[in-house]
A protein has these predicted regions:
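Conserved short loop/turn motifs at secondary-structure junctions
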Residues: 1-2, 102-105, 182-186, 264-273, ...
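C-terminal or mid-to-C-terminal helical accessory/interaction module adjacent to the motor/catalytic core
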Residues: 94, 114, 138-220, 264-268
């Protein structure tokens, strides 16, 4: 008799099959003496669409709402039906005695496998593989300690509750809003609060009124010293009272400088934490301009294809004690090229399980992202993969190094009874900073855009920026003694203005989604704690998709790197019920889902509350008195229905979309390409259709697509006609993916998945 192993993806299935010596190819599987390994393609089964319950739901009508299925049905996803049938045949083989769930170790991974088993009607015994990386060693260790599947029944219940609750609230609210206002409007408990946070930031910026502030600087030439005035009452370095500062300037001029204190304090900067996915996405956006989705895709390749990094969709920044035992193996694997010298030195050390980066209590499903024990071939990676790999390896090396130590010197002086200070820093030991220096051993193939110490250690406090706080700039300080009197200081008045909060970009929006507590109106400490523990709005696995889909549904637009709401999103926030705009809804759900996963709350009790809430929500939408106005109507008529089309701006394209939701026609007017302008090297837009497609740059340069192809070939840039065609085909496929805005909106209600 054999065990059937169900992996989440083919690549993981093949890795498991290789380790288990399953070499015989079968019907959507690989087979060995003891195991048969098959795989899903992500989700193969999902909750059924409304029309599966009643034909009346095919038409979107307010009178059919709310839709309340009892029980919920499952349906096979059409495009993956072939693989589902292959898995089902393996499930019911006479020689298969039990099932090993080897999908991702987490709530959604559990749901992938359980939905398959439920839809297939398979009731064979279940075992669970729970691992954080797919290296051979991790797989072997995992199979040596398989767990009873019944231990995860509560996790399954929590996953099903999350899916069903999102279906009830998301689909019903979206249909109600769309029918009520005759516009393509979708909402959900994650995407809508995300929009509300951006709206709040935009309002802060609109309402901001800059205030001028003033300070004093005293400079001496012998010794060379720059001193900053400090308010003796508040300790601040600036004042909003110009008259006071001008008066002080006159009073203190030509007064001697007396050094009253020279204080040297030994200090440390602790090692930064390891990366979880959100922190890595933030860093990649800040350093390289990668979107959250791009970073996740790159990470996925490094995890699945290269197998050099651990599981990417983690929300932990720590390692478990069992993983700590493998550090030397990981150093040996990543200790090549630019990391060789430092990795070799570190491999001679030992680490206790009391190290700051080891904390079993802060690792749930998966530990932080670190290198695997797999041998690395940097030459097989793309430039983008190298950059992300470099971030992770250097952070891994950094946490194995001690704190950076330095002496901070603060000179306090008096001029006419007023206090002035100067600050300087002298490094004593580099500590973890060594991992971010070229002295770690870069080679010709290494990317030059590594993080510097300042990038990591000098995070500007947003509240200080808003308030116009002034920091004393560090400088190389002269050797002066207390009691020294210096004559001839030059005083000058400094002036600045308070700054508004910056608009969100992808990095800061990810931070806000991860920590939305300050955007909560409620002061409920339990809710705030839950949002903190569960990772805020969405999960590390879904935030990138949520942001991307808000762009594709024309709720967000980019101006440079900054993100802004479209008119559509602003109107939606006025029309949607207040509950759906608040992070508190997610916090409340997560508190209950966490209890379900622990066996402390029954599934039926939670779903009863959700059904009641859905009824209340739809009633509120039905009774709404607002209106929706298309303020982006053009004079271009839809070629299908002749109605005027809407001009909409996506993340990387300008489009015309039919205003009639039933028609759904759309066409691309222009899209940002990766082709660079030969004059100014900015990215060019591709406009037009067919043979008339033309690249256009903001500097005024234009070039037909046909000429572009010829030029690229002549330049020997490595882009053939086939490459260009492949690129354009990819752009077209992306366009097709959103060609039916209605189908997309509701198919993707899962964008609120946890």
């Amino acid at each position: 008799m054999k065990s059937l192993v169900i992996a989440e993806k083919p690549s993981v299935g093949r890795d498991i099959a290789r380790v288990l010596n399953c070499k015989k190819s079968g019907d959507g599987c690989l087979e060995g003496e003891k195991y048969v390994v098959t795989w899903a393609l992500g989700h193969l089964v999902e909750l059924a669409a409304p029309e599966a319950y009643d034909k009346k739901y095919k038409e979107w009508k307010m009178e059919t709402l709310p839709m309340m299925p009892k029980p919920f049905k499952l349906e096979v996803i059409g495009k993956t039906a072939k693989q589902f049938n292959a898995v089902k045949r393996q499930l019911f083989r006479n020689d298969v005695k039990d099932i090993v769930i080897a999908t991702d170790a987490g709530r959604e991974g559990e749901l992938v496998a359980r939905f398959i088993l439920m839809k297939a009607g398979c009731r064979k015994p279940i075992k669970r593989l729970w691992i954080s990386s797919v290296t051979d060693k991790a797989i072997k260790d995992g199979f040596s300690r398989l767990r009873d599947g019944r231990e995860y029944d509560c996790l399954r219940d929590a996953a099903m509750c999350r899916a069903e609750a999102d279906w009830l609230v998301g689909l019903n609210a979206t249909r109600a809003l769309t029918c009520k206002y005759n516009a393509q409007l979708s909402c959900g408990r994650v995407q809508t609060p995300t929009l509300a946070m951006i709206a709040g930031r935009e309002e802060e910026i609109r309402n901001f009124r800059p205030k001028s502030y003033y300070g004093l600087t005293a400079r001496t030439s012998s010794p060379s010293l720059s001193l900053t005035w400090e308010d003796q009452k508040s300790g601040g370095m600036r004042s909003f009272d110009r008259e006071r500062m001008e008066r002080l300037l006159k009073e203190l001029r030509d007064q001697p400088v007396k050094i009253v204190q020279v204080k040297r304090t030994p200090k440390k900067t602790m090692t930064p934490l390891l990366y979880d996915l959100t922190e890595l996405q933030r860093e990649a956006n800040k350093r390289f301009g990668y979107s959250a989705k791009e970073t996740l895709n790159i990470m996925q390749r490094l995890y699945e294809n290269h197998k050099v990094l651990t599981y990417p969709r983690t929300d932990s920044r720590y390692l478990s004690s069992d993983v700590a035992d493998t550090i030397k193996d990981r150093l040996a694997a990543c200790g090549i090229g630019p990391y060789r010298k430092l990795a070799a030195r570190l491999s001679k050390q030992t680490w206790t399980k009391k190290a700051a980066f080891i904390n079993d209590a802060k690792v749930s499903d998966h530990h932080a992202i670190i290198p695997t024990e797999q041998f690395v071939q940097l030459q097989h990676m793309t430039v983008e993969e190298r950059k992300i790999y470099d971030l992770v390896v250097r952070r891994f090396l950094a946490v194995l190094l001690p704190a950076a130590e330095y002496d901070e010197t603060v000179i306090t002086a008096e001029i006419g009874g007023e206090r002035f200070t100067a600050r300087g820093k002298v490094m004593r030991t580099q500590g973890w900073r060594e991992a971010y220096e070229t002295s770690a051993g870069t080679d010709s193939g290494a990317d030059s855009s590594f993080l510097s110490f300042d990038d990591l250690d000098d995070e500007t406090d947003e509240e200080e920026e808003r308030g116009g706080a002034v920091r004393v700039k560090e400088q190389t300080l002269p050797d002066v003694k207390e009691g020294t009197v210096i004559a001839g200081a030059g005083l000058s008045l400094t002036e600045g203005k308070t700054k508004p909060p910056a608009p969100f970009n992808e990095a800061t929006l990810l931070s806000a989604m991860e920590n939305p507590v300050k955007y909560m109106e409620s002061h409920d400490k339990a809710m705030a704690k839950t949002l903190g523990e569960t990772g805020g709005l969405g999960t590390v696995a879904t935030r990138a998709d949520i942001i991307e889909k808000l762009f594709s549904s024309f709720m967000l637009e980019k101006r440079g790197k900054d993100i802004f709401l479209t008119s559509k999103a602003k109107q939606l926030l006025k029309l949607v019920p207040e509950d759906l705009r608040k992070p508190e809804l997610t916090a409340e759900w997560e508190m209950k889902l966490s209890k379900i996963a622990k066996g402390e709350l029954k599934r039926d009790a939670f779903m009863g509350d959700i059904c009641a809430y859905t009824e209340e929500l739809i009633g509120e939408i039905k009774g709404g008195e607002g209106t929706f106005r298309h303020d982006n109507l053009t004079n271009t008529k839809c070629p299908r229905c002749s109605k005027r089309m809407l001009s909409v701006k996506g993340k990387n394209s300008q489009m015309l979309v039919c205003q009639d939701r039933e028609c759904g026609y759309r066409e691309t007017v222009s899209r940002t390409s990766n082709a660079r302008c030969p004059k100014c090297h900015k990215k060019m837009e591709l406009r037009g259709k067919g043979e008339n497609q033309t690249f256009s740059c903001s500097c005024g340069y234009k070039e037909k697509l046909s000429n572009f192809k010829e030029r690229r070939q002549k330049e020997g840039a490595g882009m053939t006609k086939r490459d260009v065609a492949k690129y354009l085909n990819k752009q077209n496929q992306e366009e097709k993916m959103v060609n039916n805005p209605f189908a997309e909106a509701f198919k993707n209600l899962g964008l609120d998945k946890q």
